[in-house]
Swiss-Prot record:
Organism, as annotated: Cereibacter sphaeroides (strain ATCC 17023 / DSM 158 / JCM 6121 / CCUG 31486 / LMG 2827 / NBRC 12203 / NCIMB 8253 / ATH 2.4.1.)
Keyword Oxidoreductase: no
GO cellular component, one term: small ribosomal subunit
GO biological process per UniProt: translation
A family per Pfam: Ribosomal_S7
Entries under PANTHER family matching the protein: RIBOSOMAL PROTEIN S7 (PTHR11205)
Entry similarity comment: Belongs to the universal ribosomal protein uS7 family.
Protein name per UniProt: Small ribosomal subunit protein uS7
Chain's role: One of the primary rRNA binding proteins, it binds directly to 16S rRNA where it nucleates assembly of the head domain of the 30S subunit. Is located at the subunit interface close to the decoding center, probably blocks exit of the E-site tRNA.
Length: 156
């Protein structure tokens, strides 16, 4: 790791349809081989499906799904005297968002529906209702942190 100053954060522009920067981050994470227009159409079509399925504002549903997946604590490995402990650590706000986005996309890709927009819509709808693989991933992370609460004094 460089000892110079940290790299400056790039400004992320809001998306075209909703004017939301978090949605742009989501699209950027979904994008494969630089095909942003494909990622945009997948996300917008998925949000339309979520709107018809849940009968509510698509952006509001997206943010609720993201909030339901965001972890508050995670475990990090810490070596102390030859033993490696899983130390529970609170997750920074930026990382919470990044993890939630990553987990939602990974969970959607693993689903069995035919198209990616169907999978993404189903996963977002499930996350809105506190179900689904992405929410389970958050629960598992919290359980791990809770199980290793005894090592929380090893924080750094």
């Amino acid at each position: 790791m460089s000892r110079r100053h940290a790299a400056e954060k790039r400004e992320i522009l809001p998306d075209a349809k909703f004017g939301d920067t978090v949605l742009t981050k989501f699209m950027n994470n979904l994008m494969i081989d630089g095909k942003k227009s494909v990622a945009e159409s997948i996300v917008y079509n998925a949000l339309d499906r979520v709107q018809t399925r849940l009968k509510r504002e698509p952006l509001e549903a997206f943010h609720e799904a993201l909030d339901n997946v965001k972890p508050s604590v995670e475990v990090r490995s810490r070596r102390v005297g030859g033993a490696t402990y899983q130390v529970p650590v609170e997750v920074r706000t930026e990382r919470r968002e990044a993890l939630a986005i990553r987990w939602l996309i990974t969970a959607a890709r693993k689903r069995n529906e035919n198209t990616m927009e169907e999978r993404l819509a189903a996963e977002l709808a499930d996350a809105c209702n506190n179900r689904g693989t992405a929410v389970k991933k958050r629960e598992d992370t919290h359980k791990m942190a809770d199980a290793n609460k005894a090592f929380s004094h090893y924080r750094w």
